[in-house]
Amino acid sequence: MHSHDFRDAEEFRGKNVVVLGSSYSAEDVALQCHKYGAKSVTIGYRHNPMGFKWPNRMKEVFHLDRLEDNKAIFKDGYEQEADAIILCTGYLHHFPFLSEDLKLKTGNRLYPPKLYKGVVWQNNHKLMYLGMQDQFHTFNMFDCQAWFTRDVIMEKIKIPDLSLIHI
């Protein structure tokens, strides 16, 4: 399963869960599984561990090497029985449904260009991108962007002439 499809940790109660990844989604999924009673949670990282002092039944290990039967075997030789494997391996923004002139194209995810207040597309005020910032106050930022967007749609906030503003 990919973290994109993760909805409820309840289904992992009493199970040995292996989480592959070492960023926000992996942390969230691993802790949810632990909180809802997973028998064990093993977090496999590829580059750097998250480095937290994990609760009992949670462990970080270096890089999955292979799967054999129902075991996850890691590069350091550690083996963990796996009832479930959850991939928290990141994602790429992809907008195949938009024409090229409307697609956000940037490697800068801290403050993407051409988005007024980080949301409204400069060349078309009816197009709004939410959640484009990369891992910076993520969920608080999503909430703020949703409220801002709501107020723009309800015409409580007026968008200035963006052709006069360098974004």
Kindly give the residue locations of the regions a language model identified.
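Conserved small/polar residues in nucleotide/adenosyl-binding loops
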Residues: 166-167
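Flavin (primarily FAD) cofactor-binding/catalytic cores of flavoenzymes
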Residues: 1-162
